[in-house]
Each structure stands twice: as structure tokens, then as C-alpha cells.
């Protein structure tokens, strides 16, 4: 298994796009409003996966105490900060320096010690993490196989990986790209439907890196429930993975 390189995973135009959004990342009514709506749903899945993997009490407030967590494509820290509050020693990696600056400032303001790094996951040679997460990221990278391989290298034996990404379906194209950008739910240029991957494709990418996909849940939307975990995979999905 080879490490990814800067030229194979980071798309400069993607890093620049998200870097321009850094100043509004923590504004729930700003350009990242959809992420703020999505984050509680993702966090619910992440917490349940942590408890299932390590047998921790769902009522406990620090189930990751003594564990190292890595979030790749961390943006300004929307996942890193909750992981730190769950007790983890957290490292966040992002390709945009503007995001790392915003993340560091926000964490400092909240009294959280999070190790933020700007760069490409393979080039940073990070290893030994009990939990590796990368949510809504793989659809933005240049070489998906190299990216998954680098995530696998970072994972410690017995560790847990959690990934989420939009599915490549007619429904996701209509709602997540065309409609969402047209009415301003996400900034234009955020999503490129051809880069979305199906669960089957992700399963194959994980297998190529020596990983086995575990739990698979959809993230759906309805007017009554809003965004929620679902058996419907048509829009977005979130998965666990472990070493095969």
C-alpha cells in the first residue's frame, strides 16, 4: 500500500473554493448553513458508532478519553471540536490554510487544544489514530483510491474509520447540485455530481486499502423530519469501516 502524494489527492481549485468560505464556516446562517444542519445527524451516527465499536456507555460524556482522533478535510473544525469534547486528542487536517486558521482561532476561543495541520494526508505521514473520520470530503479529491489508502495508513490497528459522502444518483444531482445551488442552500461550485461515488464504489475503494465497510446508513431529508438518518441512500450516506 503506497501513501498518497500531494499531486494525487488535493485539487487546488477545491482547496481554494473552500478556503474562500473560511470566514463564514462557523456562522449557522452563512455559506456553511447546510453543514450546520447536517452536523447533528452525522454526530449522532458517529457517537453511536463509537459506543458500538469500543463498548462505551451511550450516557458517558467522554467515550474517547485516552484515544487519538484524526479528521481529514476538517474545514474550520465542525467535527473536530465535538470529538475533542468527547475526550479525544484530536488532529485536524485540511488543504486550505484559511480553514486551518479559522479552525485554530475558534478552538482557542473555546479553550480546546486541537492540533490543526494544513496539507495532504499522505504527505503528513500521520499514523496511529484510533478514530479516523472524513465527512463530505472524498467527492472533492483527485485520486479517491490514494486518498482512502492514506486514511487507512493513518488508522491504528483495531481502530474505527467513518466516512460520509453524497451518492451519485439522479436524485442527488437534482437536489444536491442543481436545486441546492440555484436557491442558495450551498455556494455555487461546491458539488460536482460526476465526482460523487456510490456505496458499491466506496466499498471497493476500502477493500483496495485493506478495509472492510461496516454499517451503512443513508442521510435523507423530509419536510417533517428535516435531515435524518435513513435507510434511503439516494442522497447521502455515512459508513463505518475497519481493517479487513
Tell me the role of every PLM-derived stretch.
Residues 37-65:
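Conserved alpha-helix/loop element of class I SAM-dependent methyltransferases that forms part
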Residues 194-210, 216:
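Short alpha-helix
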Residues 172-182:
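Short, flexible, mixed-charge acidic loops at enzyme active sites
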Residues 57-62, 67-171, 199-202, 239-243:
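Conserved SAM-binding loop
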Residues 165, 184-201:
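Acceptor-substrate binding/catalytic loop of class I
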Residues 1-32:
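N-terminal, positively charged/glycine-rich alpha-helical extensions of SAM-dependent methyltransferases
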Residues 227-244:
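Core SAM-dependent methyltransferase catalytic element
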Residues 50, 54, 107, 206:
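Conserved hydrophobic residues forming the short capping helix/wall of the S-adenosyl-L-methionine
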Amino acid at each position: 500500500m503506497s501513501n498518497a502524494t500531494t499531486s494525487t489527492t488535493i485539487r487546488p481549485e477545491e482547496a481554494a473554493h473552500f478556503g474562500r468560505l473560511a470566514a463564514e464556516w462557523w456562522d449557522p446562517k452563512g455559506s456553511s448553513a447546510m453543514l450546520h444542519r447536517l452536523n447533528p445527524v452525522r454526530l449522532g451516527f458517529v457517537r453511536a458508532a463509537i459506543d458500538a465499536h469500543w463498548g462505551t456507555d451511550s450516557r458517558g460524556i467522554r467515550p474517547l478519553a485516552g484515544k487519538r482522533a484524526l479528521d481529514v478535510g476538517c474545514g474550520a473544525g465542525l467535527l473536530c471540536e465535538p470529538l475533542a469534547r468527547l475526550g479525544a486528542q484530536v488532529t485536524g487536517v485540511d488543504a486550505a490554510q484559511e480553514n486551518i486558521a479559522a479552525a485554530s482561532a475558534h478552538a482557542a476561543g473555546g479553550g480546546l487544544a486541537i492540533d490543526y495541520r494544513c496539507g495532504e494526508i499522505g504527505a503528513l505521514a500521520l499514523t496511529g489514530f484510533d478514530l479516523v473520520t472524513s465527512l463530505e470530503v472524498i467527492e472533492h479529491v483527485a485520486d479517491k483510491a490514494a486518498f482512502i489508502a492514506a486514511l487507512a495508513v493513518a488508522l491504528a490497528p483495531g481502530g474505527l474509520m467513518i466516512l460520509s459522502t453524497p451518492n451519485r444518483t439522479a436524485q442527488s444531482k437534482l437536489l444536491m447540485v442543481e436545486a441546492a445551488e440555484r436557491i442558495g442552500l450551498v455556494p455555487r461550485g461546491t458539488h460536482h455530481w460526476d465526482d460523487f461515488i456510490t456505496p458499491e464504489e466506496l466499498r471497493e475503494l476500502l477493500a483496495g486499502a485493506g478495509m472492510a465497510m461496516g454499517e451503512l446508513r443513508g442521510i435523507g431529508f423530509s419536510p417533517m423530519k428535516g435531515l435524518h438518518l435513513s435507510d434511503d441512500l439516494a442522497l447521502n450516506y455515512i459508513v463505518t469501516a475497519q481493517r479487513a
